[in-house]
């Protein structure tokens, strides 16, 4: 059994790893900063690691893991092995954006409000120097489409202020008011009719004022006359009161006459 195992492993002993990269790796990536070692450098010449099967090729992902840990933005390597996974989604998004740019159907108003939100930054899946990689062009087209849709979704300011939908327009209410005011409005100030009206109004105002003044003066005059008459009456009352008092005093001082019969006797 050991001899059989030794016979199986003996052709691979001392044989280095294959130096040619597999079809999954892109050529021309050697020597770029920030990249891990290329698949051709995975195996050192002269290593004694045995190969399990000669007809199968192994893929070492340690280079991708090291490169992702070294880059702070955690961007994936620009390899075709990952590009195949994302080409379908990006091609579908790019086709939709190109249809909108080439005069396709307009988006509903709800989509414009979503496009105005913060845009999520997609990772850079490819470089310009990589042949056959359309991801940078698709990302640029998508960005331009989003910007154009956001600008088109913003409402343009109206040329004139529009009235609210719940209330009637302001131009309808002042119409009857203006008509009423126009019906009540008199003649022009320069017309003779206007002057005659003004003169008649002035005369009426003057008459009313003069009448009020005359009434006031008459009332004041009557007040003065009544006050003087009242004073005279008070004086007359006082005079009569004094006369009455003097007469009473005079009659009290008079003696009773003897020739007068006593009261209660008959003189006949």
From Swiss-Prot:
GO MF term (any one): sequence-specific DNA binding
Cross-referenced InterPro entries: bZIP, bZIP_sf, C/EBP, C/EBP_chordates
Transmembrane segments annotated in the record for this chain: none
Residue ranges with Pro residues bias: 155-173
Entry keyword Ubl conjugation: yes
Highest taxon, organism lineage: Eukaryota
PROSITE patterns per the UniProt record, alphabetical: BZIP
Renumbered residue ranges of the record's region Leucine-zipper: 226-254
GO cellular component, one term: RNA polymerase II transcription regulator complex
Localization per record: Nucleus
Subunit structure: Binds DNA as a homodimer and as a heterodimer. Can form stable heterodimers with CEBPA, CEBPB and CEBPE. Directly interacts with SPI1/PU.1; this interaction does not affect DNA-binding properties of each partner. Interacts with PRDM16.
Function comment: Transcription activator that recognizes two different DNA motifs: the CCAAT homology common to many promoters and the enhanced core homology common to many enhancers. Important transcription factor regulating the expression of genes involved in immune and inflammatory responses. Transcriptional activator that enhances IL6 transcription alone and as heterodimer with CEBPB.
Name of protein: CCAAT/enhancer-binding protein delta
Species of origin: Rattus norvegicus (Rat)
